[in-house]
């Protein structure tokens, strides 16, 4: 663990990140990570294949932060299809301050591991819509 990082990243998460990045899935997919407060470690919360943005919104807890690595099947105006991958840091305004700090202080280390350039932050679940994501990915 580095000096500016509160939580370690579990080996399971590192393996799942590697598998997720090199997956050949043709669907939207989400790798949802959370902080195990007692162990101060980032752990796998859930992997969901074939999940829409709306379903992802319904899956995330209302009052607890999460890290989401999301692959989105994007159909461009010229009908090309791409699968951009992004890192979404979800931290609800009303979550516990201690939890917000743990997530915020670990975010940079996780971003380095994920190695994605598309990094977004949302504070409310209703911000996470397909329109929002498409606008960010353009």
From Swiss-Prot:
Reported consequences of knocking out the gene: RNAi-mediated knockdown results in not severe delays of border cell migrations in stage 10 egg chambers. Simultaneous RNAi-mediated knockdown of GMF and flr results in an accumulation of F-actin in follicular epithelium of developing egg chambers, border cell migration delays, and in deformation of bristles in the thorax. Simultaneous RNAi-mediated knockdown in border cells of GMF and flr enhances the accumulation of F-actin foci.
Compartments where located: Cell projection, Lamellipodium; Cytoplasm, Perinuclear region; Nucleus; Cytoplasm, Cell cortex
SMART domains per record: ADF
Pfam families for this protein: Cofilin_ADF (PF00241)
Domain (ADF-H): residue spans on this chain: 3-138
Source species, domain of life: Eukaryota
Main location, first listed in the record: other
GO annotation, biological process: actin filament debranching; border follicle cell migration; negative regulation of Arp2/3 complex-mediated actin nucleation; regulation of actin filament polymerization; regulation of cell projection organization
Record keywords, A-Z: Actin-binding, Cell projection, Cytoplasm, Nucleus
One term under GO cellular component: lamellipodium
Free-text tissue specificity from the UniProt record: In ovaries, expressed in follicular epithelium, in polar cells, migrating border cells, and centripedal cells (at protein level).
Signal sequence segment: none
Database matches in SUPFAM superfamilies: Actin depolymerizing proteins (SSF55753)
GO MF annotations, alphabetized: actin binding; Arp2/3 complex binding
Gene3D superfamilies: Severin
Family recorded in the similarity comment: Belongs to the actin-binding proteins ADF family. GMF subfamily.
Function as written in the Swiss-Prot or TrEMBL entry: Inhibits Arp2/3-mediated actin nucleation. Together with flr, promotes Arp2/3-nucleated actin filament array disassembly. Promotes debranching. Regulates lamellipodial protrusion dynamics possibly by facilitating lamellipodial retraction. In egg chambers, enhances the retraction dynamics of cellular extensions in border cells and thus together with flr plays an important role in directional migration of border cell clusters.
Name of protein: Glia maturation factor
Organism this protein belongs to: Drosophila melanogaster (Fruit fly)
Phylogenetic lineage: Eukaryota, Metazoa, Ecdysozoa, Arthropoda, Hexapoda
